């Protein structure tokens, strides 16, 4: 189970309980052998206590931006922005998921040229991200408007392969 901090608060007017700003992602596998590409989803984190061994950084690197290490991700994801109106990936779909969220799932659980299936495609985010990451994809959606949005986004993905928050293979 992965918890995604959606930043899209639900129950804004709730007076009898906590507002929900989390979404659950259930990650399931079948059998003992499955794909999990840990190195593909490591995160770049700022080092608070930079240890050295023989004068050299122990498990971190220094750059002009500071001291960072690549770390294994946890099952709580709070580094993902919901698509805002000004972001190129944004559509008017009420539950659109961010490309970065889907990218983490696809990179962790598939390899290049693998097939990714989304039986409830909505605005097509899964197919768009699969295409940008070199995967094959099948999107299924019954709403004609959402299908049109998805088709446009897939065409746009030919021109723009960037995923907000994912740069040079690092989140």
Language model features with spans:
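Core catalytic lobe of class I
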Residues: 1-149
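S-adenosyl-L-methionine
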Residues: 151-171
């Amino acid at each position: 189970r992965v918890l995604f901090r959606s930043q899209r608060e639900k129950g804004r007017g709730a007076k009898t309980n906590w507002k929900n700003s989390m979404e659950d992602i259930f990650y399931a596998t079948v059998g003992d052998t499955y794909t999990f590409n840990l190195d593909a989803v490591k995160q770049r984190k700022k080092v608070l206590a930079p240890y050295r061994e023989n004068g050299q950084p122990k498990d971190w690197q220094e750059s002009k931006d500071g001291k960072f290490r690549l770390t294994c991700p946890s099952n709580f994801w709070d580094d993902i922005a919901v698509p805002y109106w000004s972001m190129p990936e944004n559509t008017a779909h009420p539950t659109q998921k961010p490309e970065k969220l889907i990218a983490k799932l696809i990179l962790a659980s598939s390899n290049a040229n693998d097939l990714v299936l989304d039986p409830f495609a909505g605005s097509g985010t899964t197919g768009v991200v699969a295409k940008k990451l070199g995967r094959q994809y099948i999107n299924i959606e019954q709403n004609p408007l959402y299908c049109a949005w998805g088709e446009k986004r897939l065409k746009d993905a030919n021109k723009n392969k960037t995923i907000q928050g994912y740069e040079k293979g690092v989140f």
